[in-house]
Structures are given as C-alpha cells and as structure tokens.
Curated annotation (Swiss-Prot):
Keywords: Metal-binding, Nucleus, Repeat, Transcription, Transcription regulation, Zinc, Zinc-finger. SUPFAM superfamilies: beta-beta-alpha zinc fingers. A zinc finger (C2H2-type) spans 159-184, 191-223. Transcription factor that probably regulates the expression of the gene cluster that mediates the biosynthesis of squalestatin S1 (SQS1, also known as zaragozic acid A), a heavily oxidized fungal polyketide that offers potent cholesterol lowering activity by targeting squalene synthase (SS). It comes from Cochliobolus lunatus (Filamentous fungus). One of its GO terms (cellular component) is nucleus. Residues 45-99, 118-154 are annotated as: Disordered. GO terms for molecular function: zinc ion binding. The keyword Metal-binding applies. It is found in: Nucleus. This is C2H2-type zinc-finger transcription factor clz7. Belongs to the GLI C2H2-type zinc-finger protein family.
Length: 234
C-alpha cells in the first residue's frame, strides 16, 4: 500500500515543472520505485513557457547573477545605447528630414513684386460697362411694372358682370362672380315680392324684404343705377 501511494503521488506531481526535481529526489533517497518506472518521471520535458520556468528553477543563484550581468541593454532599459548600436544613429535620423528651401529676403521681394502687380485689376476697361448699367435697369423695371398693370386690368375685366342688367358690376374675386351668375341665371328660380314686384335670388332675402316693409324704397344697383320694377301679372 505504501509503495502504490508513493507511486501515485510521484505521477501526480510530475505534471508541474517544480515537481520534477522533487520526484527524482524522492526516488533517489528512498529507492522504492522500480528502474522501469524511473524514465517515466525523469524523461518528461515541458515545452514552451514551462521549459523556461524549469530552466530558471534549475539555475543556481550565482548563475542567475552572471546571466543577468551578461545580457545586452535593450531599447527599453537604455534607448541611447540601442540607437548607437543600430545602423542608423540618432543624429542621422534627425537630419534625414527634408527642410524647406531657404531663400533670401531679396529673392522673396523679387517674386512678390510681379504677383502684386498682376493681382491689381485694371478698372479703366470697365468704364463702358458702368455707363450702360444705369440705362438697362430702368427699362427692366418699367417692363415688369407694365406687365403687372396689364395683369391687374385683365383680372378686373374678368371679375365684372355685363349681363342681367349689371352694366359691368365689379366683384372682389372670381368665385363671387360665379355665384352671382348662378343666382341670376335662368336655371335658378327667382323669388318675387307680391307687394312691389321686386325679385330676389334667395327666399330668405325676399322674406326679410317683406318683414322690413321696404317695398316703397327704390332699389338700386351697386353702381347707383335704378333697378327696373317688375309688374305682377293679374
């Protein structure tokens, strides 16, 4: 029982790099494991990061100090030494940039002079165009005003009624003119006052006329012309 438990313990501890030395030391001291079982523990070699950890563990303190002293300086520990060891030194990298062309003050003045002369426009050639502008503007404004007046007179003529004895009665808009023609047309019945013979396009207007007893009042158009009185047939 003791032999099997120690064998299982040695196999479990072999999965870590630190336990390899421990397993070999246990087998060396006690000698209970067989010679066939020894290579299973001693010949195992970890790979990758574990190998570096094992190598680090196996080194003695004196070897670690000597190895750390022999390491070369890197760019992180000493950037100046890294630049000196490289092919392109620091001074050469700074001077590798292309500087702008340096010119003297006299050269800049000679270049600016023709540019300043060409930037100034020549106003002498604009005299004819300036004389024509005042003459063109009034003509354009006059034509626009004339077109506006023509449109206004045409609209006024369209909103006038020359039928039904209206003698060119003017309405505010076209819709009022259409309603006037519909009310005074032959298709719509006319409501006549039985007292004076006046006719109305709506029954409400005829009834108000009778209530106010305005039969003796002379009825006139909006332009002041007297309306003809219709005679009621017996």
């Amino acid at each position: 029982m003791e032999r099997t438990s120690k064998y299982a313990e040695a196999i479990d501890t072999a999965s870590q790099p630190e336990t390899v030395i421990r397993a070999s030391s246990v087998t060396g001291q006690q000698g209970h494991l067989n010679s066939v079982d020894m290579p299973l523990v001693e010949t195992w070699r970890p790979e990758g990061p574990r190998a570096s950890q094992q190598n680090h563990i196996l080194l003695s303190p004196e070897q670690e100090v000597s190895q750390s002293s022999n390491t070369s300086p890197t760019s992180e520990s000493d950037p100046q030494a890294f630049l000196e060891a490289s092919e392109f030194p620091q001074n050469q990298t700074k001077t590798s940039r292309v500087d702008p062309v340096h010119m003297e003050i006299d050269d800049w003045a000679a270049i600016d002079q023709p540019m300043a002369d060409s930037a100034q426009p020549d106003f002498e050639d604009w005299g004819d165009l300036g004389d024509l502008m005042p003459e063109v503007l009034p003509e354009s404004s006059g034509t626009s005003s004339g077109a506006a007046t023509d449109n206004g007179t045409a609209a006024d003529d369209e909103n006038r009624c020359w039928d039904h004895g209206c003698n060119g009665k003017k309405f505010l808009n076209h819709s009022n003119l259409v309603r006037h023609r519909r009310e005074n047309g032959s298709a719509r019945p006319k409501f006549i006052c039985p007292m004076c013979g006046a006719y109305f396009s709506r029954s409400t207007a005829r009834n108000q006329h009778l209530e106010k007893k305005s039969c003796n009042r002379v009825r006139r158009y909006s332009n002041g012309r007297e309306r003809p009185r219709l005679r009621v047939k017996d």
